[in-house]
Amino acid sequence: MKFYKYHALGNDYLVINPQDLKFPLTPEKIKIICHRNFGIGSDGILLGPLASTKAQFALRIFNPDGSEAEKSGNGLRIFSRYLWDMGLVDEKPFSIETAGGIVESAIKDAGKTVQVEMGKVSFWSRDIPVIGDDREVIQEKIFLDEGIFTFCAATIGNPHCVILLDDINSEVARNFGPIFEGYPLFPNRTNVQFMKVLDRSTIQIEIWERGAGYTLASGSSSSAAAATAHKLGLCDSKIIVKMPGGDILIQIKDDFHISMTDSVTKLAQGELSTEIFAIETVINI
């Protein structure tokens, strides 16, 4: 089975064309394929292009734990670059249907850069979702034994919990990310961003991704964090988001529609051996 591997700011995905699929892509097989010791290794799988009646292409996005994601900003940029590499698109904007909605993408600089119109950020509990009264989830508190955390919740097709802190690092994300991901307020679990505002045009985030764990970069996380900083009046509408994997430009329109632009790198392509499925289950290391 053919695969194509790309990364966007260190956030790596395998692209698999459904026409090349030789077996059902079950959650257990996804776990093995994405495992960095027993499989190819990646932050997820992009299955496409699929047929769509609503857009030019459709895409399914899978997390490394086998669950399906509604939307991934870096995944969409990677898939867009794959479509370009396969000669399926040119530099005219094109549409992609995901479980989290339809986005518009455009190839820039002869394939070096991809711009994705991510859609509109909502802070309303009914959209995210967040349990409780219908409200915008802004500056609410979660009480843990380790302290009180103030957060905002948002969705851009998938759920996010943004926590503003004075200091952030990978240890904070690894220690507290799993707690917030599965916190009872979020019935579908949530992605988590620990955010520090550097100035009115720059923020820094550490990311714990639902279904993937600690992540070097995330497009949808960048979008949610930047929108939150703008919503709180801490940043202007054009924001550089700094992550361990690199920086990305987020532009926020008046109605909180998000545009995201950065590069994508092709890493490899090859044939997946079915021998990797000899292991019955993935060992969590």
Curated annotation (Swiss-Prot):
Keywords: Amino-acid biosynthesis, Cytoplasm, Isomerase, Lysine biosynthesis. Pfam families: DAP_epimerase. Its main location: cytoplasm. Belongs to the diaminopimelate epimerase family. GO terms for cellular component: cytosol. It is found in: Cytoplasm. Homodimer. The record marks H160, E209 as: Could be important to modulate the pK values of the two catalytic cysteine residues. One of its GO terms (molecular function) is diaminopimelate epimerase activity. Its EC number is 5.1.1.7. It comes from Nostoc sp. (strain PCC 7120 / SAG 25.82 / UTEX 2576). The keyword Amino-acid biosynthesis applies. Substrate binds at N11, N63, G73, N74, N158, N191, E209, R210, G219, S220. It is an enzyme of class 5 (isomerase). HAMAP family: DAP_epimerase. The gene is dapF2. This is Diaminopimelate epimerase 2. The keyword Lyase does not apply. Pathway: Amino-acid biosynthesis; L-lysine biosynthesis via DAP pathway; DL-2,6-diaminopimelate from LL-2,6-diaminopimelate: step 1/1. It catalyses: (2S,6S)-2,6-diaminopimelate = meso-2,6-diaminopimelate. One of its GO terms (biological process) is lysine biosynthetic process via diaminopimelate. Catalyzes the stereoinversion of LL-2,6-diaminopimelate (L,L-DAP) to meso-diaminopimelate (meso-DAP), a precursor of L-lysine and an essential component of the bacterial peptidoglycan.
